[in-house]
């Protein structure tokens, strides 16, 4: 596990994250997979070793004291006395063998270097979205993965959400693509959580628009493709907090159907939302020539109200944190859990000679089939940096994406 923050451990700025992931996702899932005998040795690499005593104490409170029979042991890099070592992950990777698995949840601008190092060592790799920030990095990583014959995929749990899976399958029956609109937001507190990189090395579009850009590419990719991107941004609230970031970013993307007709997509993401009943508002509308689909992922018809937390809309379909009557973790059916489980099972099958990395193209969000997602996000950033100028996605005669052009 490379990265020690909110998604891995739920530990942010010395305490549990002020979000729906206070117990983390990655480490908890790996502890449970180890209980089942599906992973063995666990290592965790960060850049600040002095955080690890706090991380271990936090995990004991939110995992060890909550669930029965979970071993929380892991090896950490760098040492607990090392305040700063951004390359500690290299020493952790050197402890691994070809065929081992690496999960990366770090700031977006670090993904490519970490991924390249893992692939070079022959490890199978799952990287937080966006898998990388630049199209040329994505194509280089794809080539390296195929040369080393390893599995490289993007962690995109929405591909396991039963509502999104069903919508994707139905969208393919709705004829040519016409219009797509998505919105995803998180509260202003996330600006403090991600203060170290927000607006400096990445933005809210990379962080949140990645979800629905990938979903749309996954759903419509068999009959349409993105061809032009323009971006616009709203500013002011983040800057008032001393953070040099856009508040809200919207990508306007032209799509071309195989039939020659055109479609339009609008992806909007924001991290200046007020605190509300959910940590993330997230919804989309899709229109095809023969029908439409509307999904409100934030509201599943299940609400809770407590003295401690007030009114909230719950989504145990993502991660079920409440233990069962025997005190055991029973979140194995959550789509947040299953995206890691299926990657680990794939790595195990490849290691056992039962499958090859190419067998998972179309089954996982592999580096081979997420090129468009990276290209749209990269083009959006280029457009923003060019005062909203359009950026074209360039394809060769065989329909393969080869570059971007302002």
Where are these regions (language model features)?
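Terminal low-complexity tails and localization/encapsulation signals of metabolic enzymes
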Residues: 1-10, 75-80, 321, 343-346, ...
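N-terminal glycine-/serine-/threonine-rich beta1-alpha1-beta2 phosphate-ribose binding loop
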Residues: 1-121, 139, 143-148
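Predominantly a Rossmann-like dinucleotide-binding segment in NAD(P)-dependent oxidoreductases
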Residues: 5, 151-153, 158-246, 251, ...
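Glycine- and charged-residue-rich phosphate/anionic-cofactor binding loop of Rossmann-like
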Residues: 40, 353-373
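Short helix/strand-capping hinge loops at secondary-structure junctions
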Residues: 122, 128-130
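Hydrophobic residues in well-ordered beta-strands that form the structural core
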Residues: 127-128, 152-154, 295
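Conserved PLP phosphate-binding loop immediately N-terminal to the Schiff-base lysine helix
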Residues: 131-136, 160-162
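Contiguous beta-strand/loop segments that form the cofactor/metal-binding neighborhood of enzyme cores
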Residues: 207-309, 329-332, 336-355, 377-381, ...
